[in-house]
Amino acid sequence: QNYRNYFDKQTGFMRGKLSATEWRTPFSPFVSRHMKDDFTEGNAWQYTWLVPQDVEGLIALQGGDQPFTQKLDSLFIAKGDMGSEASPDISGLIGQYAHGNEPSHHIAYLYAYAGQPWKTAEKVRYIMDNFYTTKPDGIIGNEDVGQMSAWYVLSAVGIYEVNPANGTFVFGSPAINEAIVRLPKGKQFHIVVKNNSAKHIYIGAISLNGKPYTHDFIRYSDIMSGGSLTIYMTDKPGNFGTLPADRPHSVF
């Protein structure tokens, strides 16, 4: 939880320090100086969210669910000059969100932790539709050991690991209608998506192995056990996954 020491409550951003009590100045959440600044290939707008190990703590640090989601909303529309020394890897921009660089990849899924999974669905589907093609230059940024493609594969199936260390996948907005995950010892995990379309981007309900499932996440252990997951899509945001007990958690 050392990240808390770098959160400036006055500006609402993570920022660099000269000492335990002194912030580095001048400061702009937009500016990025490649290899010369406190952020690598990014700025404070992008790196403030890089706390996958304690999303609940980050939400509390920002004042709760509503201020947290309002800040996320602002991220996707904020406009500002990153400066002439910004890395070219900061690409695929939606406001200050940079899908072309991996530190941003989990951000669209953070809405689910604060009870607004429909915004995760909207952002994830937009990114898949607009930042990936089948052309030779079909990815929006640096592939970096396959992460740009891995984000798409997981998101297209409808899940994503915000915290890879805690064994859970957050639901998003599946782009395909069926997937089979082949597992050891002849097992398989079968994902079927019903009523999916360009307009039906929101998850309305889910069943796991034929039983109603209300959580907005699925555990790795459930997938590895084999079975079936059916996702029912709708064209309007609903209440699926919004209750505190059904939201994903970064710490279990």
Where are these regions (language model features)?
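Active-site core of glycosidic bond-cleaving carbohydrate-active enzymes
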Residues: 1-175, 179-190, 221, 228
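Short strand-turn-strand beta-turns centered on an Asx-Gly dipeptide
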Residues: 184, 207-211
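Short aromatic-glycine motifs in intrinsically disordered, low-complexity regions
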Residues: 189-198
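Short proline/glycine-enriched turn/loop segments at secondary-structure junctions
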Residues: 194-195, 218-222
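Beta-strand-rich binding/interaction modules
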Residues: 201-205
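Solvent-exposed beta-strand/loop surfaces of large extracellular or lumenal domains
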Residues: 210-219
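C-terminal beta-strand-rich structural cap/linker in extracellular carbohydrate-active enzymes
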Residues: 220-252
